């Protein structure tokens, strides 16, 4: 087996500033209002879904489904990504590199009709009237928009949800504590897994870069933040499924077929299933795909050898990994788990005790 060179980038020591969310909301009435709106089912067209339906605290603000379910009961195209730590991202969408801000991103889940997600009506007089008449919401809107002529508007709903989401920061994992003070030590298995993660052989960190183990907030270059990992190669014709081709949908360039946003690995133990389409059930399956240099499917409509897709990222070459090494790597990934946010009311459903 080749000797692995352990590379630990300096940037892993540089963490984004993170203040306690309780402190932030105390001085940010829009975030307080946004907290309630995020968990409010009335913002969906039939009052069946909220933002939290697809981004639940229990699953690190994902939903546990292969593909999320819309307010009208249909499966959406993609797996719900975590929205923890996304305020500094340059990219937000699985396959649309033109979405650079939360203000742009929020419009699709709120208003889209084809397909419907929440299906909120931009001019929903009944929803805005409810906010105005409800004692809780009228008080919260008054605090957030006192003095404005039009307190109750779809624009303000967007703005407050964004303020809430911007403060959903989770960087208190065992790994973070180990780096921060050295008072918490990684165990032998976690340390060996970290060595593998940053090695030149596996190259995990080349795409999943600290501090948040993604390129979405460390690079504003599309080719750095999006990649084809050799998941599909329909009929060996260098194609992904026609309904979900990746960046090619927007750019109309064949070289972008199969490229999707590289997700964060923070809390990855809580966010299964994996990939843009939720097709990978667990980390063991995922590592098998990477170690093989992509996925080969032998039968069915998706059959083809993703390992040979012409757009596959050059780092996805495959590697040898033993069962014990795989276990160690998963132990390291587990050290990126932070559930301390579950003790912070700001992250939880404010209606849970009502």
Can you name each region flagged by the protein language model?
Residues 1-35, 108-110, 122-191, 195-199, ...:
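Post-cleavage N-terminal segment of exported redox proteins
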Residues 19-108, 176-289, 295-302, 344-354:
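Short glycine/threonine-rich turn/loop motifs
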Residues 90-94, 113-118:
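Short, polar/flexible loop-turn hinges at active-site or ligand-entry regions and domain interfaces
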Residues 100-115, 128-139, 300-306:
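Short, compositionally biased low-complexity segments
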Residues 124-143, 231-234, 254, 292-299:
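Amphipathic, soluble alpha/beta structural segments
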Residues 277-340:
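Extracellular low-complexity, Gly/Ser/Thr-rich intrinsically disordered linkers
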